């Protein structure tokens, strides 16, 4: 936890423990063997992502010894080639190129008249032998790689096939999440008690094992060579007995029934029963709950089945009536597990919204107006569609499995090297002496940390535990202290270059290059933080507050001498704008964080690196669950077409007033984002609202920035303001009063999207003079707005 250092040392460092991971109320705290299991699982999960994203081939690693031998043999063949040239004398020295065939032909010609014909013949033989050995070892290395690819036919290498990678990404997060997060909070009144429910949960391992064994049988059948092929791809047929098509493929007889009764039904029984039992069972915080183990295994079985079946031509049937019924069962269990884990790690808001969309899917044919669809969707059709790249495996998971988890690993390395403490201490040294100093420190520190953190509420907990008590200490009302922290942490989500992962989701959805998005975000982010700074400064002036004394603050000179701790951030930004891929830039920055730590007392050795990967694995669970849950909503929108019909409403409104259409879009984006983490809020709003704005003729970048800003601002918009509520929990103020105050402090952000809609120069579009003029006039406008509000 973050602590206020009451015994200031000689350097007057204030921040101590900002980098420490906040503990959620329902997280299990293991000891001994349980801790080792979870830590190893989390570290392995994060490390495998880093390996996969950087294209390290699993089969190549296995074949590495043979590959080294082949390379040495190839080098020896090169040496034999040079020896033959030398043996040929002047003719060999005059030879150009590296063609073995031509050199051997030259040797044959030379031997007829040369005095050293025997020596030439021996050199030719040595060259042939060396080349044969190199070729044999190369074939052997290839055979090793191929053999392991066949043994792990469903997991051949890194980088994995895209769908397989995303399925395993979600499956691993489900397993880790259920083992780590309990169904209910471990509050003050919590008391573990023995229960027969543990025995019932243990019995649920039987249907889980039955389902897993069935999938293993499917996998063996597909890899046995008995499965039919069409166009070079193995096919998967799940047809009921008596089907005419089944008669042509007798090997698939019984698959349909097995998918229902031996895979689907046992899996759903175990899933739903374990969720119910988990809600009422009470297991000690340092022990695994059997119901959670069942849910973790269910998540892995779902992944195992989907990887198996999606590796065949059956993937082409996704979203149609021909989808295998087992996919519908797996998707039902998978979606249920995703929603349950989302409830555990992010609350009910997103789960309720997802539930509303699911209900809409199956009742849309009964509804009037723009919500209506012509034909009802069957259970098999919808769930056969939702666990695909049009839903759960779509843009949200694409981003969480690549950019987001990579930057979570980066953030974990920064935390392990205690860079977060330095950020906060640097902010105190730079701004602590200004009037209302701690509030201004909160703006800078929370903005920096929030940019990397990815969630407004999570950042409030991390930095607010330090800044909020200090703000109260210098005279801020507890309501205002919480509001400032909430507004500053929310601003981190719009601060380039990382933007709390929002920039990466926007790039994935729109296809706009990441660099262009990050550059466009600069002026709006400056306007937001200038506004918050002015609001804080005016409040401090109105209340006659002082800054902190110099003897209460870290020494600025010492902080400047440690400026090298910003090197990982600088490398990240520099690499991105040099045109490096996001993956490569993030990896370089992560490595830099470990290297820079050796210039500090917190040197990262092997143990610290493993700890960083463990921390990253744990930190990633919430965002992965949230993105997958948002993917369910995206799947509903893509199947029903409700987004297109919403666009038609916006077009009708725009015919009367474009400003009215924008205001309506703003309200929908905020409503959809209420109670949801930033990434999910934007992903859902982008699916519903952004297409309509684009159809109004608004440029795609402007439309998505408009939606993104209001999705972010839902975190400080009453009545459901996650960041404000988290801050109120620390400050001790009324949550609703805090959310109203944070809304007031961040009021400029509600105007900025309309500003860049009417003047695209604020998004760095236009000449340098236009951009400078737009930025300057916007800052003046923000100044007068802040003055008027205060």
Predicted regions and their residues:
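Transmembrane alpha-helix boundary signature
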Residues: 184-188, 217-227, 277-285, 304-320, ...
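Hydrophobic mid-bilayer segments of alpha-helices in multi-pass membrane transport proteins
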Residues: 36-43, 166-178, 198-208, 259-275, ...
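Membrane-interfacial loop-to-helix junctions in multi-pass transporters
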Residues: 323-329, 390-403, 430-442, 474-480, ...
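Transmembrane alpha-helix interface/packing and boundary motifs in multi-pass membrane proteins
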Residues: 411-415, 446-455, 487-493, 576, ...
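Low-complexity, proline/glycine-enriched hydrophobic segments characteristic of transmembrane helices
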Residues: 54-162, 209, 221-254, 765
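Core transmembrane alpha-helical segments of multi-pass membrane transporters/permeases
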Residues: 97, 136, 340, 344-345, ...
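Hydrophobic transmembrane alpha-helices that form the pore/transport pathway of multi-pass ion
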Residues: 424-492, 498-505, 511, 678-710, ...
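Long, contiguous bundles of hydrophobic transmembrane helices that form the permeation core
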Residues: 2-42, 61-65, 192-196, 201, ...
